[in-house]
From Swiss-Prot:
Positions annotated with a glycan in the UniProt record: 197
PROSITE patterns membership: PROTEIN_KINASE_DOM
Biased composition (Basic and acidic residues): 646-655
Gene3D superfamilies in the cross-refs: Phosphorylase Kinase, domain 1 (3.30.200.20), Ribonuclease Inhibitor (3.80.10.10), Transferase(Phosphotransferase) domain 1 (1.10.510.10)
Stretch forming the signal peptide: 1-31
Protein kinase domain segment(s): 357-639
Gene Ontology molecular functions: ATP binding; protein serine kinase activity; protein serine/threonine kinase activity
Protein name in UniProt: Pollen receptor-like kinase 1
Amino acid sequence: MPPMQARTLSVYNVMVPLVCLLLFFSTPTHGLSDSEAILKFKESLVVGQENALASWNAKSPPCTWSGVLCNGGSVWRLQMENLELSGSIDIEALSGLTSLRTLSFMNNKFEGPFPDFKKLAALKSLYLSNNQFGGDIPGDAFEGMGWLKKVHLAQNKFTGQIPSSVAKLPKLLELRLDGNQFTGEIPEFEHQLHLLNLSNNALTGPIPESLSMTDPKVFEGNKGLYGKPLETECDSPYIEHPPQSEARPKSSSRGPLVITAIVAALTILIILGVIFLLNRSYKNKKPRLAVETGPSSLQKKTGIREADQSRRDRKKADHRKGSGTTKRMGAAAGVENTKLSFLREDREKFDLQDLLKASAEILGSGCFGASYKAVLSSGQMMVVKRFKQMNNAGRDEFQEHMKRLGRLMHHNLLSIVAYYYRKEEKLLVCDFAERGSLAINLHSNQSLGKPSLDWPTRLKIVKGVAKGLFYLHQDLPSLMAPHGHLKSSNVLLTKTFEPLLTDYGLIPLINQEKAQMHMAAYRSPEYLQHRRITKKTDVWGLGILILEILTGKFPANFSQSSEEDLASWVNSGFHGVWAPSLFDKGMGKTSHCEGQILKLLTIGLNCCEPDVEKRLDIGQAVEKIEELKEREGDDDDFYSTYVSETDGRSSKGESCESISFA
């Protein structure tokens, strides 16, 4: 071989392996698939809750894993809450999730310094509250995170100054730093925040002028802070006071004049307002055959009327101005989108204007908003649910989650027909259920002169609820509590008393603080004791609902009046024998039913087991409920296990017609 060729071959033999080696070691983590990246991330975790991440395995796609939410097949949210997690957070592994936008590790046991989250530059929401992170957060910890909107670091052990980079985030909307040990002064924020909590730290110095109109509670527990809105402005040792003799005469001389002027102005405004309203009422007065709240009630109560009216006003103004019409209308259309987004293709389409023109009747209101029945001009009846506390996800995440819920199809679910997105509030449009909620049928029928639910109807409702809940657990495996808010007011009844679950799958959307205060899942024993939610949390909700259906007792009454809850009240009165005082008198007299009722009571108590490990899972609960019958069969010997020898009664041939629930 010629020397030149030999040298060339020698160089080739050396360079090719070297280049391959360099390529191997320089391959970034983001070359991994989502599945590989998450499994790599899992290796850095210590999981305290048994089987919490059992679904995380290569045999199934990551979008079906617990706590993993996807958008278009890519992972956009990891919701790892209440799992007793510790160890470290592998940022390099997470950087392989190129579509990741939300991280939540709240209510776990992570320790150590603040992870280098700035490597996840596309992140929009970061929730680390209620852990044990500590130490100073570097000033540049949030540099380059231009998309970050929500930062929740409450109830940790962070020290040092608030990082300057967090105050400079251009899109920041929420910042919770309460319950830490931050020191130094509060930085100037780039713009107004929707949510800010700096309470219970060791902050000092003046409150920035941009925060002078903030609720004082935001700054509670920081003894060294002064300035508006705190009352300690003039008593702070950190500022030099002017002589009080100079300030007081000026204040005292102007005070009465200012107050008089304000009172006079308010009086004039009130008088003008009353005259305007009376005049408008007179002009618009028309006879109607609508429901009691009138045609504009939905507009007023949903807050859409003003936006819609302003749009019409702009159109009129543009029409009068002539040449500027096209430009202004185009601009208005670009800013304001009043179109409903439909999730069901099998329904007759209508638009927001049809809803605004509809006669409306308020059905009820709760912690998250209110519900209205809207009767469209076609005669179609819809329910519009208004949510004001649904800002835990951005527009894209919200729409993707709505599509996921819209794909659910089961005869025991109330389908979401359409939705309307506004930054301030959201509207969900559903079908109208003729008999209203289970809560009304259980607790208000007698006072309204309507018949109570009998045993066969109650059993039918329990079976339907269980089936619907099981379906949710099968089709929403990534949610820790697929329903999350199961209670009697969130079960609606059709004309034939078929139950329909509603308000399911909303935990990822509801503001975290409000969810923890009001949603049913956060009242479970595991959350109250260990600050965690599990797959069996919905089962606990099912158990409480079963006990409510059988006893007629409203669960909320127990938490308000005593430390005892409904499950412990039933347990204290149930000794394995028939106890009429436990059951709702409204069930009346039925035939051959005691054994089946006691079976269901036992299932309900097993679903309410405080120890999560001993509690039934949803599959076991559904299987046992499906075995129940309206009346005893000849082959059923269950009742004998609940009848004491001294009682002497048997379900065989015994008619429940003689049983009184009084």
